């Protein structure tokens, strides 16, 4: 089943609104915590070798949707290229990787630092990247 099909089974909790190198070339959660402003922060690291990196390097901002797949408890993130003010900024790192700092999302999803993606898929026509993370409770 493709990740795009999984989208239909996902109960979206967060919908569109306002570092460390992974040796395996996978997308990884690298940092999270509260900023001084009280906002939560979750930074994704997307390695330079990743095809997602190649796609996102052409994009300045992404809308982020995130949800939990009801059957498995896995977490699906959907990043869609946008010009909107509400998008999150895509930051290119010196290492060639890319990070996206996503506010207010970390704790609602139960994502923890160090979690590595299970798989990802790019839908070029809709300028969207799907990233599937394992169920954080299956450790």
Features from the language model and the residues they span:
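Short, structured coil/loop segments at alpha-helix boundaries
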Residues: 49, 69, 107-113
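Short, well-ordered beta-strand segments enriched in hydrophobic/aromatic residues
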Residues: 42-49
């Amino acid at each position: 089943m493709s990740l795009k099909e999984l989208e239909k089974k996902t109960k979206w909790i967060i919908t569109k609104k306002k570092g460390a190198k992974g040796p395996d070339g996978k997308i990884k959660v690298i940092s999270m915590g509260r900023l001084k402003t009280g906002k939560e922060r979750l930074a994704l690291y997307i390695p330079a070798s990743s095809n997602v990196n190649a796609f996102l390097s052409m994009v300045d901002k992404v809308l982020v949707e995130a949800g939990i797949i009801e059957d498995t408890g896995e977490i699906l993130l959907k990043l869609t290229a946008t010009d909107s003010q509400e998008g999150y900024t895509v930051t290119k790192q010196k290492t060639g990787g890319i990070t996206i700092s996503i506010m207010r999302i970390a704790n609602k999803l139960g994502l923890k630092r160090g979690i590595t993606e299970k798989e990802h898929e790019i839908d070029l026509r809709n300028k969207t990247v799907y990233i599937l993370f394992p169920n954080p409770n299956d450790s």
